[in-house]
Amino acid sequence: YELGYDILKPKGTLTYITSNKWMRAAYGESLRNFFAEKTNPDILIDFSGNQIFDTATVDTNILMFSKEENKQETHACVVKEKLLINLGDYFRQNSTKTKFINKDSWVILSEIEQRIKAKVEAVGTPLKDWDINIYRGVLTGYNEAFIIDGKKKDELIAEDPKSAEIIRPILRGRDIKKYSYEFADLWLINSHNGIKENGVKPINIDDYPAIKKHLNLFYPQLEKRADKGDTPYNLRNCAYMDDFSKQKIIYPNMTKFLPFVFDEKGLLTNQKCFIITGKHVEYLTAFFNSSLFKY
């Protein structure tokens, strides 16, 4: 987008068909801010989950912007029909004028929906102002070594019962369902790097000879990885490791309709999940899984 913007003449226009993830995802904040501050977004068409383009493997959108000041009057629509005879006619009949003025999620709403949204925001409390924390799952840098199946877990514990102290169940993004999860019998060797703020020392792998023997099979890869701890045997720093032991909400990072599950068993998650800790997490789980939240 920025490269195209750079070669535009003043008031020149650019139209792209791309993935629509930038419209709402956190990683799209800087791009949304760029559009709002540097361009005039004239037309935005979100195809949502409808596969209009045969060669596209992702949900798509069309954005047309001009190289001029944002007039704060974007003609936008969401395509809700799977089969379109004439996109131009559909756009003229269903588009609405919307202001996109900052990095907040770009959500296309009808005039009635915009009024409802404004009314809710006027009396409600934004999620960011609730007493919660949101964290990413555990990054190992080399899952093949640190994430093991149940058979390997049993072997390590049989060889050295002390191994059980740092082996914990782990969920992946694909395991998360609405109000539940499908445990794939995967386990994390949690050789964490300590939590300095809490006075927790890093795991000394020499205290766990069976696990060290297992990890030594992958030592060249462990040594090369960028996100390691004090030693190649340790995971990278994770200041919120204790939060995985608290009551929390787990949800995957890449699905169209996010499922949420409440956990109080101390499950760990991989990098394909996020967790939410804090107050009212049971209530929030129910709300996040509701049709009201999806609306």
Residue ranges and their predicted role:
Residues E111-I275:
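Polyanion-binding catalytic cores of nucleic-acid enzymes and NTP/SAM-utilizing transferases
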Residues F35-A36, R172, N216, F288-N289:
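Alpha-helix boundary recognition
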Residues Y1-I157, P161, N198, V261-C273, ...:
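Signature of N6-adenine DNA methyltransferases within the class I
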Residues P41, Q221, F293-K294:
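A general structural signal for well-ordered secondary-structure junctions
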Residues K21-M23, N70, D175-K178, G194, ...:
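Short, solvent-exposed loop/turn segments at secondary-structure junctions
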Residues K272, S291-Y295:
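Glycine-anchored helix-breaking recognition loops at helix->coil/strand junctions
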